[in-house]
């Protein structure tokens, strides 16, 4: 669950919906990844396993706030990662998403996270051994593209429309030596400077709003135009 806090409520966005938004950024990236379909599939479905956790809002009894993906309890989160990898339909996407999940555990000394990381490293080596030359040659590039598109989608989900207040993105985005700055033209129109996209496109992501006492307030769609 992605949680954006407001003075009187919380905006919640399901992880898999955010993942599909990531895929939209990847589809319109001007330098199309190779192999295209398998990479887009991986980026679009990189949070597939979260759909089971996101069926309901889980509350942190200590803070009195909903758990988000940043502080969700470790054991169910790791189970969601494993389930997401099981559900992916092709080995290339599985490898990319495994690399993505394992990167979250870098430097961790938590026993469960270390075990998960090492297990995924072994999985990745097996999958690499079955890849074509094109798949293997572009694997690291496509992994970095997944990370970038993940962050672009999180930027949209974590910030109020028209703002750049979340601390993760104050300095923009970096990708393979290039820097991209997010620029809001208005509350419903976003561009990156310099422009990395092949053409303008639209984004739509469903959201819910809950009051601080947990009562449902509303649901709707965040709609956004990305210009080029």
Where are these predicted regions, by residue range?
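Surface-exposed helix-capping loop/turn segments at secondary-structure junctions
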Residues: 31-35
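Divalent metal-dependent catalytic cores for phosphoryl transfer on phosphate-bearing substrates
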Residues: 3-13, 24, 36-159
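An active-site-proximal "capping" alpha-helix that borders the catalytic cofactor pocket
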Residues: 17-30
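Non-catalytic terminal regions of proteins
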Residues: 118-228
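Weak global preference for isoleucine
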Residues: 2, 11-13, 40-43, 210, ...
């Amino acid at each position: 669950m992605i949680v954006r806090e407001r003075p009187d409520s919380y905006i919640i966005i399901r992880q898999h919906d955010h993942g599909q938004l990531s895929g939209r950024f990847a589809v319109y990236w001007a330098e199309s990844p190779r192999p295209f379909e398998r990479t887009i599939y991986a980026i679009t479905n990189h949070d597939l396993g979260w759909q089971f956790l996101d069926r309901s809002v889980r509350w942190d009894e200590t803070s009195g706030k909903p758990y988000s993906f940043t502080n969700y309890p470790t054991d169910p989160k790791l189970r969601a990662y494993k389930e997401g990898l099981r559900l992916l339909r092709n080995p290339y996407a599985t490898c990319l998403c495994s690399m993505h999940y394992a990167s979250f555990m870098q430097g961790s000394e938590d026993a469960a996270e270390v075990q998960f990381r090492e297990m995924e490293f072994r999985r990745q080596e097996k999958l690499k051994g079955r890849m074509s030359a094109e798949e293997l040659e572009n694997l690291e590039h496509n992994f970095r593209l997944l990370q970038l598109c993940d962050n672009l989608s999180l930027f949209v989900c974590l910030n109020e429309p028209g703002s750049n207040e979340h601390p993760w993105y104050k300095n923009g985005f970096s990708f393979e030596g290039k820097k991209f700055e997010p620029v809001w033209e208005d509350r419903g129109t976003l561009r990156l400077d310099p422009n990395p996209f092949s053409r303008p496109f639209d984004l739509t992501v469903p959201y819910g709003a809950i009051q601080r006492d947990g009562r449902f307030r509303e649901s709707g769609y965040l709609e956004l135009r990305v210009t080029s």
